[in-house]
């Protein structure tokens, strides 16, 4: 009998598709010591059908598309300011809801836990807007989306590339023209446990409960975004990309999921989703006349279905063609290669497992010397004779 889905847990993306795939409901998702969700198999319920492993999307090669590349932003400036980039997701979602469909995306739920939820009307979309720099639990949403699609109800499912692949794995051979999938260029997903621990630290510091957290606040502009926590007592905690500890740690790859560092699900124009969204970084050089610092999206229409969905939202979009894909990859390297783990990742988690998130410790880790700098320091402190011997060896 199985105890887990994959022999190599480092490959598991935590999409949760196996929970829906299992015919005996023998799988649940449980957090590990780093705070990431992994499948746990109930050996007494398992019938060794191996469906979970056979349909697991981890490590699979993605189909290559000749995507149509666009720059785009919603004409509605207020919507752009509420969105991480240009507001394209909301326009796509509104169209699906208008047709009687359901939109799935990441939102804050109970106890500030990030999870995938379903929106049945436009008022429920607000919680899905904006980036969530923490891995969302999509387990239930995948199962619910599959059920809706079997009833021929339109569904827009947005998420990381691995979550989109999880949904498609759960659907199996069931193909539906009612499904529209939207992923994004993913930097990697941080630990839900680490984020929860950080919120606990903030609440102790402010003596109040966190009511809201924004990862991409645009008060200082789209490019110079900041993170803002809002508390029940009316106080706010805000910081920039290099001063807000959790945001800084995420951007420095300090606590991303292990599978993110060998991700096979986001490579150039290889995507499983109909549409891929990203920030149009470098807009000030690519299209300076359109860059008002309220947000611009880079859009990849990967399939005919994706192109049609964008055309249906066309009246509400300012869009233009982008022909230089290579230029986009220079501004956003995650389009091509997964990020490398921070060299102090292991040191962070070793202490985190005993003490939880410690902002001062995180900033010290990230601002301290790296391996190259430490090596140079050791060399500079060598005796003069040793320095001469090293120099002589190099010159030979």
Question: Can you annotate each of these PLM segments?
Answer:
Residues 10-25, 45-59, 160-166, 256-269:
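Local cysteine-cluster metal-coordination motifs and their immediate loop/turn environment
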Residues 132-181:
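Conserved nucleotide-cofactor-binding alpha/beta core module
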Residues 4-5, 11, 17-40, 50-67, ...:
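Iron-sulfur cluster-binding cysteine motifs and their immediate structural context
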Residues 99-102, 203, 208-396:
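Long, compositionally biased charged/polar accessory segments in the mid-to-C-terminal portions
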Residues 1-2, 44-151, 325-345, 350-358:
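Flanking helices and flexible, charged tails adjoining ferredoxin-like Fe-S electron-transfer domains
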Residues 2-13, 41-47, 152-155, 242-260, ...:
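Immediate flanking context of iron-sulfur cluster ligation sites
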Residues 179-201:
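Short, flexible loop segments at boundaries between secondary-structure elements
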Residues 84-87, 110, 157-167, 188-190:
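Gly/Ser/Thr-rich loops at beta-strand to alpha-helix junctions
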